[in-house]
């Protein structure tokens, strides 16, 4: 059977390995598997959110409010915008998909960092767009500008902070750069980890209202999957000028999040204090990873997220290292598929991190 030939250039995205796979393949009990691969909040959603989900389960047979009025109002209030500035998706990556399909076609170009969120590439290839990448792994706006001037792409992707590396540009540096961008270029600012960046350094904070007022051709993406602890609920959002939102709404399928997901996100917005406590604990534990790396003579990228990337260089092979850890019940993310000999580790709970240090040290001491 023949399919769209543009699919030939697309690699199937591989998410972080699930706990269930480790149980099946290695016979390890679920309670002995530690998953530090998918950048989930290890503390989960707040107890009040869990309670709200449980109560809402009796309505699982009902479609959700497709207007998502209450959630849009909550997000509008949080960011000081109007509900017509908000669109909801099944994760922020669904809004990425909407944006690329709404803006691009086979004659379009998109620009992104060499090493960044893989779905930018996937969605762009789906429409046949030409993909432009900077030469450096991390975001360097001088490189973006050099390519932008020559190519004038239809979409510019900025991942702030950047996944899978963890670095983050200062807000003013970003704004100075965006002043030079044409109105016809859609600037997608992916803020999936913005709650972490803003907590660690206020100079990294991107205010969605400020962004879209200064740069009307931009869209800010956020998610409930990371800091809010709702990865399994799959809820993300976009904030942009109404004209952009209206275009994206034409790409949205009806009822694109579930009744339970909608309720969870609405309640999660009320739990800012809980979320902040988990973020504080995240950076407390991250310091332990930085100290471990320094003690082992391993480079790392200073992170503004809930994960840390260890650059292994010639010390050990990241594929062999991550596989060895996997066989012992520790799931981390191997970055070899990005062309980097590195592993990305989600910051877990204290006891999970203890076990991670123990296993990594055991492996590294062999070399």
From Swiss-Prot:
Residues making up the signal peptide according to the UniProt record: none
Enzyme class: transferase
GO biological process: L-histidine biosynthetic process
Keyword vocabulary terms for this entry: Amino-acid biosynthesis, Aminotransferase, Histidine biosynthesis, Pyridoxal phosphate, Transferase
Reactions the enzyme catalyzes: L-histidinol phosphate + 2-oxoglutarate = 3-(imidazol-4-yl)-2-oxopropyl phosphate + L-glutamate
UniProt pathway annotation: Amino-acid biosynthesis; L-histidine biosynthesis; L-histidine from 5-phospho-alpha-D-ribose 1-diphosphate: step 7/9
Pfam hit, one: Aminotran_1_2
Cofactor(s) named in the record: pyridoxal 5'-phosphate
GO MF term list: histidinol-phosphate transaminase activity; pyridoxal phosphate binding
Modified residues (N6-(pyridoxal phosphate)lysine): 226
EC number(s) on file: 2.6.1.9
Record text on subunit structure and interactions: Homodimer.
Family: Belongs to the class-II pyridoxal-phosphate-dependent aminotransferase family. Histidinol-phosphate aminotransferase subfamily.
Protein name (record): Histidinol-phosphate aminotransferase
Protein's gene: hisC
């Amino acid at each position: 059977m023949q399919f769209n030939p543009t699919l030939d250039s697309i690699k199937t995205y591989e998410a972080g390995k699930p706990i269930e796979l480790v149980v099946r393949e290695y016979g390890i009990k679920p309670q002995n598997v530690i998953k530090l691969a998918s950048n989930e909040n290890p503390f989960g959603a707040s107890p009040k959110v869990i309670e709200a989900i449980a109560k809402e389960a009796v309505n699982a047979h009902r479609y959700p409010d497709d207007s998502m009025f209450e959630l849009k109002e909550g997000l509008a209030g949080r960011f000081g915008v109007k509900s017509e500035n908000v669109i909801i998706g099944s994760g922020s990556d669904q809004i990425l998909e909407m944006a690329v399909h709404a803006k691009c076609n086979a004659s379009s170009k998109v620009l992104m960092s060499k090493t960044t969120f893989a779905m930018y590439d996937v969605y762009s290839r789906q429409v046949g767009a030409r993909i432009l990448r900077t030469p450096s792994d991390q975001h360097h706006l001088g490189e973006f500008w050099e390519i932008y001037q020559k190519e004038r792409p239809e979409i510019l992707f900025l991942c702030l902070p950047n996944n899978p590396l963890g670095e983050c540009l200062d807000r003013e540096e970003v704004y100075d750069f965006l002043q030079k961008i044409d109105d016809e270029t859609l600037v997608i600012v992916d803020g999936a980890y913005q709650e972490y960046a803003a907590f660690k350094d206020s100079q990294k904070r991107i205010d969605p209202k400020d962004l879209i007022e200064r740069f009307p051709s931009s869209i800010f993406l956020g998610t409930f999957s990371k800091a809010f602890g709702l990865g399994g609920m799959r809820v993300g959002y976009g904030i942009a000028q109404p004209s952009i939102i209206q275009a994206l709404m034409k790409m949205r399928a009806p009822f694109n999040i579930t009744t339970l997901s909608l309720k969870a996100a609405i309640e999660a917005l009320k739990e800012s204090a809980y979320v902040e406590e988990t973020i504080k604990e995240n950076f407390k534990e991250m310091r332990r990873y930085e100290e471990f790396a320094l003690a082992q003579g391993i480079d790392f990228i200073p992170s503004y997220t809930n994960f840390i990337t260890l650059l292994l260089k010639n010390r050990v092979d990241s594929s062999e290292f991550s596989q060895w850890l996997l066989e012992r019940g520790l799931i981390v993310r191997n970055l070899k598929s990005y062309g980097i000999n590195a592993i990305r580790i989600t910051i877990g709970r204290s006891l999970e991190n203890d076990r991670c240090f123990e296993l990594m040290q055991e492996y590294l001491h062999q070399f």
